[in-house]
């Protein structure tokens, strides 16, 4: 089988490519250039996709003895990921750019190009598992629950899964690092990237401010009482507690959280933890890993990248998905993905459009 190994320059993608070589496949390494002005880690950047990352990927390919190329996808990435990121924040939503990159870049633009060039599959270093079930391929959580990335892969459809390979799905991260060291890969001890790759300093608010400009407005409580001001509602996300800079302290002394962001009125609504609870949500643009459900579905729903999944009933209603949680949950932000699970299996996903807030005291 001809396999295109997407190599970021990190330990995970390097070991994933190595395992494909060991399996006897014809492997070609490709590093994705996501920016027209590649940066250096020496500039203080902590994310991925720097010049050093490209060099690390090439060195790993050399150790493995496989051909290596750099593919320029910067313009597509700018349009489909960065511009989408900015547009979502401008509308008061909180997007997940890693999920969008998987959906529109790695398993769309890159996969399409790979298939056109005669490759059979794209291999990545994601921690997730693909298994064949009675109705086709199934996407499952990884064996390493701390590293599981099935949430950001929940946008993949059955045709995309047919051409995806995740060799690390059954491994622990500690095992992957040990294997990299044993193979003589220089990236064995390279730190993981935790930042949004196009915001390497981690300052999302500054990035948004520099691209969207100042848009001052009020911070109010759920009754409409003014508590403070801001210079851009897009800097806030539902569930946020830090950095609110309230000019008027809450009369009860309890912490305040962001409940709602309204870019049209430039208003940020804050409230107590109890007011943050929601009983359900409406999702749009559903994507199913298999056949869509024809009846209400009992499952668990993960509604943010690093959160637990909550029991819920999911019902497909035309082009939307209705989710009713079995118990109120907190921190559900429009723009994020709701990913539906049956135990470890990913059933599908949808983008959170609206939430239903619980009555205080419920």
Curated annotation (Swiss-Prot):
Residues 147-149 are annotated as: Interaction with tRNA. It is found in: Cytoplasm. It comes from the Bacteria. Its main location: cytoplasm. The keyword Aminoacyl-tRNA synthetase does not apply. GO terms for molecular function: ATP binding; tRNA binding; tRNA-uridine 2-sulfurtransferase activity. The active site is at residues 101, 197. Pfam families: tRNA_Me_trans, tRNA_Me_trans_C, tRNA_Me_trans_M. Disulfide bonds join 101-197. Its EC number is 2.8.1.13. Keywords: ATP-binding, Cytoplasm, Disulfide bond, Nucleotide-binding, RNA-binding, Transferase, tRNA processing, tRNA-binding. This is tRNA-specific 2-thiouridylase MnmA. It comes from Acidothermus cellulolyticus (strain ATCC 43068 / DSM 8971 / 11B).
